[in-house]
A protein has these predicted regions:
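Conserved RecA-like P-loop NTPase helicase motor core
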Residues: 1, 220, 396-516
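Helicase-associated low-complexity regulatory tails and linkers flanking the ATPase motor
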Residues: 4-74, 234, 307, 467-547
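Conserved pre-motif I regulatory segment
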Residues: 62-103
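Walker A/P-loop
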Residues: 96-119
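Conserved Walker A/P-loop ATP-binding site and its immediately adjacent core
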Residues: 111-116, 126-151, 366-368
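SF2 helicase catalytic motif II
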Residues: 189-192, 197-245
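Post-DEXD/H (motif II) to motif III coupling segment of the RecA-like Helicase ATP-binding lobe
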Residues: 222-281
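Conserved helicase/translocase motor-coupling segment
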Residues: 289, 306-415
Length: 547
């Protein structure tokens, strides 16, 4: 039959010259899926009918078109196959009564893993109802994009949909008559706790078949969201590279109870070490850059530390809540050490023209930790804005194409696009690159913020470890603050405690770096010996986390 049709010997087939098809596709073809392709084909056939009116071609049965239309609306996995981690996470979630925390390293596909669980449930139930809560507007957009990639329909994002209140109200009313109507709701923690959203949750509280997904789930343990937990929803997924809430045992405990998942293994755990070994994240080199406090800064640090002593609880060994402002003041001394500017100038000036930085994130010290239960964006204080300007000037003076990446930028997508293409060499940011920014092309990171918060530096490291075809490995420089004029004769208890937090961060980075050995047997070891810090015990404790 093929030979006959090729020779134009069949009267019941229409032969459309390939050039006509090519021209049609190039000029007019807008089909986004199979159904539109078929409809486009029908339109093209009708054009041919006009020139071959003697030939009668039966239209496709409406039932078949309806079936195709239904098929095109169904969710599907957007990649050729699932990763082993996604299969194992779903299995563990099912075994834990559809509840759990997925403690997965940044960059290992937490979003896809959670949506895959929802897809699996749809395959069994033939409908889906999701509530996804995220900390920032940027993450809300990212989840919306991923949900569309899975072909989920009826996506309502409270960030992009101005009429979300009435849409959810109508859904709640209609669900009384049709409890299996598909919907994907994406909101931020700040909106989640609002009266309007809580009213919607109350109106659908009998709909136990929702799946509740909390991204960066540690935020759910904050004082606002923890009081609004949707306990009526049985299906729960918490996502976080670092689920534990620092200095908040009560919030952490309530979070673990809600998701029926506890450390260290959680429901499913996928570490950065596993991700690097399996080729999901790229390898990296790590360079600690030691920066001494000035004598004035060290004097101020000692003064604040002395003031803090009266707020130390002797029973728990922790500071009382009244110490918060002093703790912040002391942290800012470390964050904003003046010699960090000297160090980065020296570092940039030592680079040759061939090794000049590109695709580089610079994390500038920030003044405070944002509370995403109050706001879904990070607002920079005037003092902090002055600091990011000072560091920007350093790059400008060395003819780098740089851009400040701060909260509220309307052209943020265009900036990230310019960075990924190489038009922008350096992005300087406070917090805004921590959560919700996915730029695999980034291959360098400079940490100016001496954070002791594991969540922060783990997230930031993950930003530059994503795989990219043009990236062999990542490079990380970390400004490490040390006391001035260290000597063995010094009464160094304060200096020891100052540096101890820095050492823990160094070891966390170094333990997975390709140049691990050279880092440990370097100036780091000398300083630790002087201050009486057991470097190798800290290293051993760090490695136990990956067992």
């Amino acid at each position: 039959m093929f030979d006959n049709s090729w020779e134009h010997d069949t009267s019941h087939l229409i032969h459309i010259p390939i050039e006509r098809v090519k021209a049609y596709v190039l000029n007019d073809f807008k089909a986004a899926n199979t159904l539109e392709l078929i409809k486009a084909g029908i339109s093209l056939r009708e054009i041919e009918d006009a020139t071959n009116s003697s030939i009668e071609i039966k239209p496709l049965p409406q039932k078949l078109l309806d079936k195709l239309e239904q098929k095109e609306m169904e969710p599907r996995f957007p990649f050729p196959c699932e990763r082993e981690a996604q299969i194992l996470a779903y299995k563990a979630w099912k075994q834990n009564d559809n509840k759990g925390i997925f403690a997965m390293a940044t960059g290992t596909g937490k979003t896809v893993t959670a949506l895959n669980c929802a897809l699996k449930e749809w395959q069994q139930n033939n409908y889906y109802k999701l509530i996804i809560v995220v900390p920032t507007q940027a993450l809300a957009l990212q989840w919306e994009k991923e949900a569309k990639a899975f072909n989920f329909q009826n996506i309502v994002s409270t960030h992009t949909e101005k009429d979300w209140k009435s849409i959810l109200s109508r859904y709640a009313t209609n669900s009384i008559f049709n409890s299996k109507k598909n919907i994907v709701i994406i909101t931020t923690y700040a909106t989640f706790i609002l009266k309007h959203f809580q009213s919607f949750l109350y109106s659908v509280k009998n709909s136990e078949d929702f799946i509740f997904i909390a991204d960066e789930a540690h935020n759910l343990g904050a004082s606002g969201p923890i009081k609004k937990l949707p306990i009526f929803i049985n299906n729960r997924i918490g996502l976080s590279a670092t689920p534990e809430r620092i200095y908040d045992e009560i919030g952490s405990s309530q979070l673990y109870d809600f998701f029926n998942s506890k450390p260290p293994k959680y429901t499913y755990r996928f570490t950065m070490k596993e991700a690097i070994e399996q080729g999901i994240l790229c390898h990296y080199d790590y360079t600690p850059v030691f920066v001494e406090l000035t004598n004035i800064e060290m004097s101020e640090y000692r003064k604040v530390t002395d003031q803090l002593r009266k707020f130390l609880d002797p029973e728990t060994g922790k500071y009382k809540p009244e110490a918060e402002m002093l703790l912040m003041k002391r942290k800012r001394i470390i964050h904003k050490a003046e010699n960090k500017k000297v160090a980065i100038i020296r570092m940039l000036d030592d680079l040759t023209s061939e090794s000049k930085l590109k695709y580089t994130f610079v994390f500038v010290p920030e003044g405070y930790e944002p509370d995403y239960s109050v706001s879904d964006s990070y607002n920079i204080a005037k003092e902090d804005m002055h600091l990011i300007d000072e560091y920007s000037d350093i790059f400008r003076e060395r003819r780098y194409h740089y851009h400040k990446f701060i909260s509220g930028l309307e052209d943020a997508p265009e900036i990230l696009k310019g960075f990924a293409s190489g038009d922008i060499d350096v992005l300087l940011s406070m917090k805004c690159l921590d959560e919700g920014v996915d730029v695999p092309r980034a291959e360098n990171a400079i940490f100016l913020s001496s954070t002791g918060n594991p969540r922060q530096f783990i997230q930031r490291r993950g930003r530059v470890l994503r795989k990219h075809q043009d990236k062999e490995k990542a490079h990380i420089w970390d400004m490490v603050v040390v006391p001035p004029d260290i000597s063995e004769n010094l009464d160094n208890s304060i200096e020891k405690n100052l540096f101890l937090g820095e050492v823990k961060r160094i070891i966390n980075f170094a333990s997975l770096a390709d140049n691990r050995v050279s880092i440990i047997y370097s100036k780091l070891n000398d300083i630790c010996m002087t201050l009486g810090i057991d470097l190798f015990q800290i290293l051993e404790d760090e490695e136990k986390q990956y067992e």
